[in-house]
């Protein structure tokens, strides 16, 4: 009977292991939707590229995109930034149509394939910019969330509009377009910050910090918070310091974390694994 008892225990443990791996697989198969938001001139596009490059170097399958897109509706929106903004309702409609195409053609297929999708702007920008023009922030938020997949995390890079306009003029050598006027930026920033207070998915970062500091913070947050929640065993039934899947090379999160640490400088490594 003792032998039978041990056999049953072994079977039970094997089933538990299979069950746990099934949970992990089903959770990670969706992919991760990561969004960067903020007013113009915050350095979002640079940070999107840096994060995408780092994750790709660690072996993750990454899709990098932006809104407005380069599709027909996105091109119309971009053209209006220089030629004169569309009427508020028409502009919102163009953003909705552009986003629907973006979701159908890229975002949803990428997530269903288990990829990390990183976006430079998403529907939060519509809530902030078009909400500021139309004055119906809550209605726009409801409209956008009715068809757009919820992101796993939103990195909001916050900066004073005066500083952002100086960056646009000095760094880009450009004259601010119709979306980059001080009044519009102030109103959008206020809405962004309000959204950050209400939505736990939004993590706010200080855009006044150096590019390297922001990059390091973003990588740490993504790997040790977002990715960990999606792929790590610790929240299920073990401890990192004594984790058998990690020690045996079966923990996706631990492997990615170590791979990133191996590819980064010593300063990044210290921040990443501390």
Task: Please provide the spans of the model-predicted regions.
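Conserved lysine of the Walker
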Residues: 44
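Hydrophobic positions on the alpha1 helix immediately C-terminal to the Walker A/P-loop
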Residues: 47
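Low-acidity, Ser/Thr- and Arg-rich intrinsically disordered low-complexity segments
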Residues: 5-14, 19-21, 25-26, 259, ...
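A glycine- and Lys/Arg-enriched "phosphate-lid" helix/loop adjacent to the NTP-binding pocket
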Residues: 126-190
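P-loop (Walker A) phosphate-binding loop of NTP-binding proteins
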Residues: 39
């Amino acid at each position: 009977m003792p032998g039978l008892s041990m056999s049953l225990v072994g079977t039970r443990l094997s089933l538990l292991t299979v069950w746990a791996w099934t949970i992990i697989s089903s959770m990670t198969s969706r992919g991760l939707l990561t969004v960067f938001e903020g007013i113009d001139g915050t350095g979002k596009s640079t940070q999107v590229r840096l994060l995408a490059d780092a994750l790709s170097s660690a072996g993750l399958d990454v899709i990098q995109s932006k809104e407005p897109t380069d599709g027909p509706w996105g091109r119309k929106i971009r053209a209006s930034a220089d030629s004169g903004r569309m009427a508020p309702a028409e502009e919102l409609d163009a953003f909705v149509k552009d986003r629907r195409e973006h979701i159908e053609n890229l975002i949803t297929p990428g997530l269903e394939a288990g990829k990390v999708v990183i976006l430079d702007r998403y529907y939060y920008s519509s809530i902030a910019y078009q909400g500021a023009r139309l004055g119906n922030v809550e209605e726009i938020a409801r409209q956008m969330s009715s068809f757009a997949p919820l992101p796993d995390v939103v990195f909001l890079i916050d900066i004073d509009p005066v500083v952002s306009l100086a960056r646009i003029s000095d760094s880009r050598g450009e004259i601010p377009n119709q979306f980059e006027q001080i009044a519009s930026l102030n109103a959008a920033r206020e809405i962004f910050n309000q959204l950050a207070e209400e939505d736990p998915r939004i993590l706010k970062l200080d855009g006044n910090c150096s590019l390297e500091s922001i990059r390091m913070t973003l990588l740490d947050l993504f790997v040790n918070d977002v990715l960990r929640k999606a792929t790590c065993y610790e929240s299920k039934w073990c401890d990192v310091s004594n984790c058998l899947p990690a020690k045996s090379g079966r923990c996706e999160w631990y492997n990615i974390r170590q791979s990133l640490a191996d590819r980064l400088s010593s300063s990044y490594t210290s921040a990443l694994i501390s």
